[in-house]
Curated annotation (Swiss-Prot):
Subcellular localization: Cell outer membrane
Protein name according to UniProt: Outer membrane protein assembly factor BamB
NCBIfam families in alphabetical order: assembly_YfgL (TIGR03300), PRK11138.1 (NF008351)
Function, in words: Part of the outer membrane protein assembly complex, which is involved in assembly and insertion of beta-barrel proteins into the outer membrane.
Cross-referenced Pfam families: PQQ_2
Lipidation (N-palmitoyl cysteine): C21
Length: 386
C-alpha cells in the first residue's frame, strides 16, 4: 500500500516543485523498482535521528561534516552535532521560537560556525563547537539553498532573486544583487559557488551570473535557457543547480535549458548540450554526472560535452542529486531506496531499502563511510561490505 501511495503521489511531487499554476498538470508514472543483483550489502555502523526531518516538504537541507563532527538539522528547527565514529550527540540546539523554524537552506560549516537559512527569510549562525546561536539575520525572501562562505562573508541566494552577502561575524548585510524573477518558477534556488574571488549562481530567469564577491559587483550573465512554448510551465527556465568549477571552467545546467560549460573569466560558453535538470551535479574531474528532469542518470565528458552513458531505469522516482561514494555514483529515491551505480558504465551495482519515508538529499561521504538522512529524520552511517 505504501508503495502504491508513493507512486500515486509522484505527479503531485513533480508539481510541488512549481511556485504556482496548479492547473497545468501532467501525469507521470514512477518506473518500477529495477531488479538488481547487489554485489555488496551496505552495513549500518550507527543510527540516530533529528526532529521530524523535513517531512513531505521540498527541501535541500543536507548534513555537513567539519571540525570532526557531523551536523544535521530538521525543518522544525532542531540542529545537532554528532560524533562521526558512534553517532552520539555532542550538542543539540532548537531554533524554534514561535512556530516552526522552517529550516530549508544548509547546512554550511565555515569560520567555526554553522550557517542555515529558512523559509521564514532568516539566516542563522551557530557556534560549531557548542551549538550556541550567535546571530540571526532577517533577509529578503526564502533561503532554499545552502549559503556559500568565502573571504569572511556568507552569501545566500533567495527566492526573490536577491543574492545577499552577510558579514560572518555579526550577520550584517554587506551588499545585495537583485535579478529578475518570472511569475512562475520552480521551487528551489541555486546554491552560490564562491571561488577565485568571484561568486557564481543560477537565476530563476535562466541565467548563470557572476559577481566580484568582495563588493557585489555583477560581472556577467550567460543565458542557460531561453523561455519558449505556449504555457507558463513550458516557459520555465530556472537554473537551480549549483555551479561546478573544474580548473578554469564553470559548469551548470538549467530546467528546460542546457548543460553548459563556460570559461570562468570571460563568461563565454565553451560547449552546450541539450539537457534539462533542476538538480545539483557531481563530478570526478573528467566526467559530469547529472539527474535530468525525468530522473534519467547521465554521464558527460567535461572536455567535449559528449554523452558517455545514460540510465533511464529510475524514471520519475524523484531522485536526489547524485553523490560519489568510493567508486560509485549513489542516488536515493522517493520510496527510500539507495541505488549504487558504476560510474564507468551506468550499470546498477547494488540497491538497498533504507527507510520508506524516502530521501530529499543524497548521502554525505566520510573517510570511513557515509551518512544518510531520510525525510522523517532518521540518520544512519553506512559502510560498504563486499
Amino acid at each position: 500500500m505504501k508503495k502504491l501511495f508513493n507512486q500515486v503521489l509522484v505527479a503531485a511531487g513533480v508539481l510541488a516543485l512549481l511556485a504556482g499554476c496548479a492547473s497545468e498538470e501532467e501525469n507521470v508514472i514512477m518506473a518500477p523498482l529495477p531488479i538488481v543483483k547487489s554485489e555488496f550489502t551496505p552495513k549500518t555502523l550507527w543510527s540516530a535521528s533529528v526532529g521530524d526531518g523535513v517531512g513531505h516538504y521540498f527541501s535541500k537541507l543536507a548534513p555537513d561534516y567539519a571540525y570532526d563532527k557531523v551536523f544535521v538539522a530538521s525543518r522544525d528547527g532542531v540542529v545537532k552535532a554528532l560524533d562521526p565514529q558512534n553517532g552520539k550527540v555532542i550538542w543539540t540546539t532548537d531554533l524554534e521560537i514561535e512556530g516552526s523554524a522552517r529550516l530549508s537552506g544548509g547546512i554550511t560549516a565555515a569560520f567555526g560556525k554553522l550557517f542555515i537559512g529558512s523559509e521564514n527569510g532568516v539566516v542563522n549562525a551557530l557556534d560549531a563547537e557548542t551549538g550556541e546561536p550567535l546571530w540571526a539575520s532577517a533577509i529578503e525572501g526564502e533561503v532554499l539553498a545552502a549559503p556559500a562562505a568565502d573571504n569572511n562573508i556568507v552569501i545566500v541566494n533567495t527566492s526573490r532573486g536577491a543574492l545577499i552577502a552577510l558579514n560572518q561575524e555579526d550577520g550584517a548585510q554587506k551588499w545585495t544583487i537583485s535579478t529578475e524573477v518570472p511569475n512562475l518558477t520552480l521551487r528551489g534556488d541555486s546554491r552560490p559557488t564562491a571561488v577565485a574571488g568571484g561568486v557564481f549562481w543560477g537565476t530563476p530567469s535562466g541565467r548563470l551570473a557572476a559577481a566580484i564577491a568582495e563588493r557585489g559587483q555583477l560581472i556577467w550573465q550567460q543565458p542557460v535557457g531561453q523561455p519558449k512554448g505556449a504555457t507558463e510551465i513550458d516557459r520555465l527556465v530556472d537554473v537551480d543547480a549549483s555551479p561546478l568549477v573544474i580548473g578554469g571552467t564553470l559548469f551548470t545546467v538549467g530546467f528546460n535549458g542546457q548543460l553548459i560549460a563556460i570559461d570562468l573569466r570571460s563568461g563565454q560558453p565553451i560547449w552546450k548540450r541539450n539537457y534539462s535538470s533542476a538538480t545539483d551535479m557531481a563530478t570526478d574531474g573528467s566526467r559530469l554526472y547529472l539527474v535530468t528532469d525525468k530522473d534519467h542518470l547521465v554521464a558527460v565528458d567535461t572536455r567535449s560535452g559528449t554523452e558517455l552513458w545514460s540510465n533511464t531505469q529510475l524514471e520519475h522516482r524523484l531522485l536526489t542529486a547524485p553523490k560519489m561514494i568510493d567508486d560509485y555514483l549513489v542516488v536515493g529515491d522517493a520510496e527510500g531506496y539507495l541505488h549504487w551505480i558504476d560510474r564507468n558504465s551506468g550499470e546498477f551495482i547494488a540497491q538497498q531499502l533504507v527507510n520508506d519515508s524516502g530521501f530529499a538529499v543524497g548521502p554525505l561521504a566520510l573517510n570511513d563511510g557515509y551518512v544518510i538522512v531520510t525525510r522523517n529524520g532518521q540518520i544512519k552511517k553506512l559502510t560498504i561490505q563486499q
